């Protein structure tokens, strides 16, 4: 059963981070659509607790495993680069957030929107296993977060941090073809000849990556 964790159930409002993002808030960002409909490109509060609380619902449908979206740390702000996101638009990132988990900035750190007091990732998997439900983890090693076209560089976007929180890669708000990996160590994590919308494209040929 595939779960976009943030979109499933808000089991613990204390981890919603509703004030996060400062001038570029990241919680509950509605997009108006036709006939009174709307979409949302912000965080909405789904978390590990929400999944644990609804395991019987999942099992009653006949599922024996839950495939969840990435759990790694994503940027705290809404993205300011790219084309503004509108109802039904594709490849438009301005105003969007990393609620889906696919804009990783620290692959060693659990995103703060997911755990609760007494329920970290180990506790989450233990709770599912206790119900005889397996956990399938979505892992993205192809790219990081959106990395350029911002009016001014934003914290975390286009950056990668190591296990100790030290910055090891930074696209510095530059398009891929302007990166200089030969002379700038912070550019060496990224490909400099291909572009994936505004995403930082990880260089799979670099052993450090």
Please annotate each region the language model reported.
Residues 1:
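GGW-centered surface loops in extracellular recognition modules
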Residues 6-209:
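Substrate-binding/active-site clefts of carbohydrate-active enzymes
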């Amino acid at each position: 059963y595939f779960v976009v964790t943030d979109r499933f159930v808000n089991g613990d409002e204390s981890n919603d981070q509703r004030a996060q993002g400062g001038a570029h808030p990241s919680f509950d960002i509605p997009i108006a659509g036709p006939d009174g409909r709307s979409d949302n490109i912000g965080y909405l509060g789904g978390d590990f607790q929400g999944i644990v609380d609804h395991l019987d619902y999942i099992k009653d449908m006949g599922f024996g495993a839950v495939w969840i979206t990435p759990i790694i740390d994503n940027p705290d702000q809404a993205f300011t680069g790219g084309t503004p996101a509108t109802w039904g638009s594709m490849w438009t990132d301005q105003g969007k957030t990393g609620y889906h988990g696919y804009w990783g900035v620290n692959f060693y750190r659990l995103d703060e929107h997911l755990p609760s007091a007494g329920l970290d990732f180990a506790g989450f998997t233990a709770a599912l296993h206790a119900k005889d439900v397996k956990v399938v983890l979505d892992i993205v090693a192809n790219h990081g977060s959106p990395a350029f076209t911002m009016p001014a560089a934003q914290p975390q976007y286009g950056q990668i941090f190591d296990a100790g929180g030290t910055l090891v890669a930074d696209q510095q708000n530059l398009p891929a073809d302007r990166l200089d990996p030969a002379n700038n160590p912070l550019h060496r994590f990224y490909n400099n000849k291909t572009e994936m919308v505004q995403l930082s494209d990880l260089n799979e040929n670099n052993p450090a990556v």
